């Protein structure tokens, strides 16, 4: 199986000096997902669920509004709505996934690439962290 999607291990770190000194750091997995591979990932990757519960889960309804359609379809509608019509073939999503149904995902990045693998659009979907 030759997948383009990847998992990266890293850390979330935060430090504040005022009004009260406070800091923390904890491990996190960041997923770079080729949206065309979602069904294959769901079928072949242990502990990954697409639109169903698992250890790591991705739901279409969590992204780009709760409307109908896949994430890729909703992104295409959003780009067209704002007048962006340049063609792209691949969408890579950089995100953290739900872990045991819980989510901490303040920002999701979408990279839309053309057939030459050049970035045509870079979209950030920002969620409130509170």
Regions found by a protein language model. Give the residues of each.
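Mature, function-bearing regions of proteins
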Residues: 1-130
